[in-house]
Amino acid sequence: MKIGLVTPYVYPVPGGVNEHVRFLYENLRIRGHDVRIITSSHGLQRSSEGDVIRIGKGFSVPSNGSMGTITLSPRYVSQVQRVLDREHFDVLHFHEPFVPFLSLVVLRQSSSVNIATFHAYAGFSPAMELGKRTLSGYADRLHGRIAVSAAARHFADRFFPGDFKVIPNGVNVGRYRRAVPIARWQDGCPNVLFVGRLEDRKGLPHLLKAFRLIRKSGTEARLLVVGSGPQEREARRYVMTRGLHNVEFLGRVSDAEKAQLFKTADIFVSPATGRESFGIVLLEAMAAGTPIVCSDIHGYKGVVQRGRQGLLVPPHDAKGLASAISELLADPALRARMGAAGQERVEQFSWEHVTAKVESYYGFVIRRLAAQGQLPSGFSAPIPGAPAPIVVDREAGRP
């Protein structure tokens, strides 16, 4: 089949949705499909190249406690129609379909089978409340709906009720399994790792307070902070004024370096305060065999099993974080058991498994539409049969 993956965020700028799109693109191609990525332009990414098609220009805006993107173009309709007429997609797969405005324009003009994946989770959303009546017409054009977690499904279903298939995010298991620890930090001092954008919803201030409590108790440990963002200056000031000498800010790192850091860590901590639909970083930790301490929030409960792969702590609870981290620091055998349990569990989140589930869902939707005589005019591929079995190279964990 010819498949278009539509992302409202400027590809390949790093982010959870774009990471998802990237690996889904690669693995759908491995499974024999002809795939394109439809995105916007921004900065140095201005023109289409290879399988990446750019329409309009992306602008950064605050969204859900982080930064999002809206895409604008004075020639949207004609640009989109030209692309759709040229590419003849059988399936268009929209990621965050209601982020303005690229996905909405493509969806309105699509004559393909339209599938959407909902990635986000939030509490009350004024924008969605105001827009749901307008967007309901676009939602009616979706033939299939995927949510990356029960939390994401619950959030989307509040505004656009319907049938959702939960298919989780994936992780490149092999990259983290094969990574080599960084010798610089293999000096006998336990390493606690944080990876995330330095913004309010990721909860770094709570981890810094917890780490201060740990150090005041006399426990030896090092905190490695990966990421950048609006809270970086405040976080650095806190570390300096409290004399936390064993905290290192590493900024943004490459994918390869990130995998090495997960392999270097003795404990991974994700103290998110909420509004997380899933937690890909939790999968990355499990793939590396690193035990987890994380917030007890909706988006994380479907990934980490309490007491199996890690310990869950109420959000905003620095003392609880300190207690959980201290428990793992004091018990190497418990860390080893949780790390092994994580490596076992993460197999079901490998991109081979996830892509096979997505492909199977495409087939389910297409067969249902065909049986109802409602296949869109743009679909011209053979009707998929029963899904192929999932085969995973457990040693390599590819891709």
PLM region spans:
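Nucleotide-activated donor-binding/catalytic signature segment of Leloir-type glycosyltransferases, i.e.
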Residues: 236-256
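Short hydrophobic beta-strand element within catalytic cores of glycosyltransferases
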Residues: 291-294, 304
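Acidic anion/phosphate-binding donor-loop and adjacent secondary structure
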Residues: 47, 126, 154, 171-188
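N-terminal strand-loop element at the rim of the active site
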Residues: 7-13, 21, 25-74
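Acidic donor-binding loop of glycosyltransferase active sites
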Residues: 263-277, 290
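Carbohydrate-associated surface elements
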Residues: 41, 151, 170
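Conserved donor-binding/catalytic core segment of Leloir-type glycosyltransferases
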Residues: 183-212, 224
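Conserved acidic donor-binding segment of nucleotide-sugar-dependent glycosyltransferases
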Residues: 306-307, 311-318, 327-333
